[in-house]
Amino acid sequence: MRCPFCAMEETKVIDSRLVSDGYQVRRRRECGYCHERFTTFESAEVIVPKIIKNDGSREPFDEDKLRRGIQHALEKRPVSSDDVEKAISRIIYQLRATGERDVKSQDVGRLVMAELKELDKVAYIRFASVYLSFDDINQFTNEIEKLKD
C-alpha cells in the first residue's frame, strides 16, 4: 500500500486488530521511507441487493433513506441513536444474508417493522400506519391489540 504522506510503496503493518464486532480489521502501518505511521481499515465488500419497488422498478438500496424512515417514526421518542444504528445494521445484514440480487420493498418494510416493534411500540404504530396504509381508527386499534398479545 502506498504511503499517504510520501507515496512510496514501502509500508509495513505494525499492528492489526479486529474492530466493529469482527467485521473490520484495523491496521497500523509504517512507511519504510519517511517513517510516518497511518491507519487503514479493511472490510469485506458485500453488495446489498437492489430494491424492487411496488411498481416493478428497481433502485439501489439507500441506507440514508432507511435511516430517515426509521428516525421519522422515532421522532421525539426515547430511543438512542446507537440503538437506531444497531437496528439499521441488523436490517442491512438480513438483506445481505438473503443472497439475492433483488429484494422487494415490502420485505424491507417488514424488517423495519420488526425492528421498530422491538425498539419502541409507538414508533412501530406510526410506521405501520403509513406502511400498511391505515384508512380508519379500527386498523390502528387492531394493530395496537396485536401488540398487547
Curated annotation (Swiss-Prot):
GO molecular function terms noted in the UniProt entry: ATP binding; DNA binding; zinc ion binding
Required cofactor(s): Zn(2+)
Alphabetically ordered keywords of this record: ATP-binding, DNA-binding, Metal-binding, Nucleotide-binding, Repressor, Transcription, Transcription regulation, Zinc, Zinc-finger
Domain of life assignment: Bacteria
CC cofactor note: Binds 1 zinc ion.
Zinc finger (unnamed): 3-34
Pfam family, one: ATP-cone
Keyword match Zinc: yes
Keyword Repressor: yes
Any one GO BP annotation for this protein: negative regulation of DNA-templated transcription
Domain ATP-cone: 49-139
NCBIfam families tied to this protein: transcriptional regulator NrdR
Family in the record: Belongs to the NrdR family.
Its biological purpose: Negatively regulates transcription of bacterial ribonucleotide reductase nrd genes and operons by binding to NrdR-boxes.
Name by which UniProt lists this protein: Transcriptional repressor NrdR
Organism: Histophilus somni (strain 2336) (Haemophilus somnus)
Source taxonomy: Bacteria, Pseudomonadati, Pseudomonadota, Gammaproteobacteria, Pasteurellales
Gene name per UniProt: nrdR
